[in-house]
């Protein structure tokens, strides 16, 4: 299987998942603890990038997405989402209360206000998702 991780990085992650310390892994792999630390750090960075890439792919293929600006009251978001969904002919399988509860749990908000810009979108499986990647799909489609 193709992966972004090297064989050594996979070994380190497997052994860490089993609860081994970096020094113990270093002995098993016949290397230094510092090298194990670097391998683990780079592996986790690659995993984070892969997760972000998949989230971006979901956003690109989203049925409906709404940009939320820093300082915006999240109570206005469900109405915007429903309006965009109506325009796209998509049924949102969530109530206003469910959308707000999702935002409270997953979005960068404080006291009902967005702390920074983000996107809420309905993915291809009708799941609500949050992304920090503010791509304007409407603008791209016009070009």
UniProtKB/Swiss-Prot annotation:
Gene3D superfamilies: DNA-binding protein Tfx superfamily, archaea. Disulfide bonds: none annotated. One of its GO terms (biological process) is DNA-templated transcription initiation. SUPFAM superfamilies: DNA-binding protein Tfx. Belongs to the Tfx family. Putative transcriptional regulator. This is Putative transcriptional regulatory protein PH0763. It comes from Pyrococcus horikoshii (strain ATCC 700860 / DSM 12428 / JCM 9974 / NBRC 100139 / OT-3).
């Amino acid at each position: 299987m193709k992966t972004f991780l090297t064989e050594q990085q996979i070994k380190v992650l497997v052994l860490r998942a089993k609860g081994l310390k970096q020094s113990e892994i270093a002995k098993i792999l016949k290397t230094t603890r510092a090298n194990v630390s670097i391998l683990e750090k780079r592996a986790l960075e690659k995993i984070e990038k892969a997760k972000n890439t998949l989230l971006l792919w979901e956003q690109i293929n989203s049925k409906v997405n709404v940009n939320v600006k820093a300082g915006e009251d999240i109570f206005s978001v469900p109405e915007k989402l429903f309006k965009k969904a109506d325009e796209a002919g998509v049924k949102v399988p969530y109530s206003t209360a469910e959308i707000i509860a999702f935002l409270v749990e997953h979005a960068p908000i404080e006291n009902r206000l967005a702390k920074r810009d983000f996107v809420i979108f309905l993915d291809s499986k009708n799941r609500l998702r949050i992304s920090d990647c503010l791509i304007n799909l409407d603008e791209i489609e016009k070009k």
